[in-house]
A protein has these predicted regions:
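Long, low-complexity, intrinsically disordered segments
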Residues: 252-271
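Beta-strand-loop-alpha "switch" segments that mediate conformational coupling across diverse proteins
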Residues: 160-207
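Histidine-centered active-site loop/cap adjacent to the catalytic His
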Residues: 210-238
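Hydrophobic positions on the alpha1 helix immediately C-terminal to the Walker A/P-loop
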Residues: 21-22
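Structural beta-sheet core signal
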Residues: 39, 97, 120, 156-158
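Inter-motif core of Ras-like GTPase G domains
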Residues: 106-126
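Conserved C-terminal guanine-recognition region of P-loop GTPase G domains, centered on the G4
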Residues: 132-148
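P-loop/Walker-type NTP enzyme "switch/lid" segment
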Residues: 2-4, 11-13, 17, 28-105, ...
Length: 271
């Protein structure tokens, strides 16, 4: 258990890189580890929420392994408030955010600033590589602009990789891209292009998904529980010590997750 939730955001401005599928498969992976997960669908298509509704019709709501909430990322104030409240929810270990692709989305800045980990999937092709490079530079500029408030670690995942594609000259470009991307974050092993990775379920991993993604997800899991968890525990002890030395006359109002679930349920009915 982690004292305060770790927020993991899946993001890239380039569509079609498997961002949403990886978000759900990572949720399914974490559940098998006994991690308390919440998935928040902020993508404009709300594909995860639509899948969850289909899974509920098929399996029943009581059997769902984790909650899925839907939010509109265009509402900057709502996203800012949500992120602040999530950091103080003791009932959650990891929050997975599926972010929208457009960098013009109002709520994207507070979402990134408050994330502990940002996972950036991409493909090795002549369109996705430069688009991903542009996105990584955007995140880097944001980190420099906000300073210590943004501590997100980046995991950059070569996703749906097809080793049969690419001329010799293009393979050189891919190698150079990997070297460049490593300046912004940790570039993981490749996830191969398989039919199993072209669909997903919010109930459990499908077919061979777990086998395909586990080597990559293990790295992210280790970052959360071998590195971030001890840091969070120290931070919590420091906060508790400060509160004991300087008791406040009034307690801060406790976050009620039911409020969030009510808003999410309202949005879910409209999808």
């Amino acid at each position: 258990m982690i004292p305060t939730p770790v927020i993991v955001t899946f993001a890239n401005q380039k569509g079609g890189v498997g961002k949403t599928t990886l978000c759900v498969t990572f949720a399914n992976y974490l559940v098998t580890k006994g991690v308390r997960v919440v998935v928040i669908d902020c993508d404009f298509q709300h594909s995860i929420m639509k899948c969850r509704k289909a899974d509920i019709r098929k399996y029943g709501e009581q059997d769902m392994p984790y909650e899925v909430w839907a939010y509109e990322a265009n509402d900057k104030a709502m996203i800012t408030s949500l992120m602040e409240k999530l950091h103080n929810d003791p009932e959650i270990d990891v929050v997975l955010m599926d972010s929208p692709g457009s960098l013009k989305t109002e709520g994207l800045i507070p979402l990134f600033v408050n994330s502990d980990i940002i996972i950036v999937p991409f493909h090795y092709d002549l369109v996705t590589v430069p688009s991903t490079a542009s996105f990584l530079m955007f995140v880097d500029r944001l980190k420099k602009a906000v300073g210590e408030r943004m501590k997100a670690r980046l995991f950059i995942i070569p996703n749906l990789n097809d080793g049969r594609i690419g001329k010799r000259s293009e393979l050189v470009i891919w190698d150079n891209a990997r070297d460049t991307f490593s300046n912004y974050g940790y570039v993981t092993a490749k996830i191969p292009k398989r039919a199993d990775m072209e669909r997903f379920s919010t109930m459990a991993a499908l077919d061979m998904q777990a086998t395909i993604v586990t080597p990559v997800f293990d790295k992210v899991y280790q970052s959360i529980f071998d590195t971030l968890q001890p840091i969070r525990e120290k931070e919590l002890k420091g906060i508790q010590l400060t509160e004991n030395l300087n008791p406040k006359p009034k307690k801060k109002k406790k976050y009620d997750p039911n409020i969030v679930r009510t808003k999410s349920a309202s949005l879910m009915r409209n999808i």
